[in-house]
């Protein structure tokens, strides 16, 4: 299985488009699309392709408070042979993530973040499908 391991090509390529639009001073809309091809993340597959679409509006309520809403769609494909039409896929999975985050910075050195996140994965791999809900509170103190 690993006899040709040393002769594999471990180069990677990333194609990324990011657009940031600020219709007002308090509202920012960030859209990004990227595709990454990286065979080195899984030594058993010849190639790994990741496609991501992310939409992240940010609303700055005041100098100390802001809200973020994220929608992200990610598609990962591990493929045995990159020169075929895609019938050799080892793994094909979709991950959809959304979150609402509140940021508060009462001083220059303290940041408080609170996030509610939902993720859903559909996969034909070992881990199959899952749904996750996450709520967290983060406190950062910087000197």
Residue ranges and their predicted role:
Residues 1-143:
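Gram-negative and organellar
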């Amino acid at each position: 299985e690993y006899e040709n391991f040393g002769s594999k090509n471990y180069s990677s390529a990333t194609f990324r488009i990011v657009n940031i639009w600020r219709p007002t001073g308090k509202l920012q809309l960030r859209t990004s699309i990227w595709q990454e091809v990286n065979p080195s993340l899984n030594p058993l597959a010849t190639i790994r392709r990741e496609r991501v679409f992310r939409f992240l509006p940010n609303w700055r309520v005041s100098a100390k408070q802001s809200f973020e809403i994220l929608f992200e769609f990610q598609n990962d494909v591990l493929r045995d042979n990159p020169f075929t039409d895609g019938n050799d896929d080892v793994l094909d999975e979709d991950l959809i993530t959304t979150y609402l985050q509140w940021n508060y910075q009462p001083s220059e050195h303290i940041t408080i973040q609170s996030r509610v996140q939902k993720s859903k994965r559909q996969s034909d791999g070992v881990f199959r499908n899952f749904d996750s809900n996450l709520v967290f509170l983060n406190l950062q103190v910087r000197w």
